[in-house]
């Protein structure tokens, strides 16, 4: 869904730093499931074994628990985001859009056509913006749900965790970007969830 909305997802490390980290022998992996792979690196298996902390079987078990825990956390976040978007954000945005449409209709009924268009111009722009953001949110949430259904059928716990990281988690920022835009548009009295300023400064 392309609307020109900029998401806040930025690379944690720049390409320049990645090159410098490689030169220094530092790891700057940002994928959580892949970071857990380090538990199973031969040098770590040897170190844990020699110190009597964990044997190889225990390390594999611990890695599996970490992959499963990560997957469940992203699953929960995805379900909550979908619920908030579909059952809280979209209904409120739709009601505000209907209110604007009613206002425009009254302009059209009272004033001459050209004057009514001038008076309703800003409201019409808001109506279109709301429609675009609502469409993108609904499309992305539905796509996220279908993708989750496919991923949940995966048998390999590591591959499932990687799929949730690569295919589900990035959609959170995309959906949130459109919700943030609606938050700035919808009437404050109609918005049912706490806004950012309300989280920082209690009314």
Where would I find each of the regions flagged by the language model?
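Single conserved hydrophobic/aromatic residue that forms the stacking wall/gate
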Residues: 1-8
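Mature extracytoplasmic or organellar-lumen-exposed domains after removal of signal/transit peptides
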Residues: 13-203
């Amino acid at each position: 869904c392309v609307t020109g909305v900029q998401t806040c997802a930025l690379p944690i490390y720049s390409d320049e730093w990645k090159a410098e980290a490689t030169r220094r022998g530092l790891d700057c992996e940002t994928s959580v499931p892949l970071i857990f792979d380090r538990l199973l690196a031969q040098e770590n298996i040897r170190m844990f074994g020699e110190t009597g902390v964990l044997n190889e079987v225990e390390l594999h078990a611990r890695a599996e628990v970490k992959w499963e825990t990560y997957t469940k956390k992203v699953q929960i976040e995805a379900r909550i985001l979908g619920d908030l978007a579909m059952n809280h954000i979209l209904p409120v945005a739709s009601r505000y859009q209907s209110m604007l449409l009613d206002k425009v209709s009254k302009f059209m009924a009272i004033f001459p056509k050209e004057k009514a268009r001038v008076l309703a111009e800003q409201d019409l722009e808001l109506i279109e913006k709301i429609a675009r953001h609502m469409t993108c949110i609904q499309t992305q949430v539905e796509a996220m749900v279908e993708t989750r259904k496919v991923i949940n059928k995966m048998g390999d716990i590591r591959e499932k965790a990687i799929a949730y990281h690569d295919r589900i988690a990035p959609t959170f920022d995309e959906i949130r970007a459109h919700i943030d835009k609606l938050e700035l548009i919808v009437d404050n009295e109609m918005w049912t969830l706490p806004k950012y300023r309300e989280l920082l400064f209690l009314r």
